[in-house]
């Protein structure tokens, strides 16, 4: 734990705050990614490829394309680190990228969609973590 704290990227956490509107949009993105995680567990690469074909967000489409080609979590991290487009980003886009990467790692590991959603909403703060519970409860009621 201490080693993880010592090597943490503190510049990311000291950046300017992200607007409520951006966080709301990111919450919707996290919910969409949770649905992709459910498809990935059911249909494997076919579900991921279908999601990649219909995705508009560049950060997510890039990762879904890699997952559809069989990339693992380590390959995803390396691809995002090497891609020059994802280097110098504003705080909102940096938060989006971090959240998407964490969600894609969950999808690559075939984790349960609830776990993936929880991991992603943890980046947005406690109120969104609680909002995720309400979203999941609503989805269960609709089944």
Where are these regions (language model features)?
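Large intracellular
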Residues: 1-143
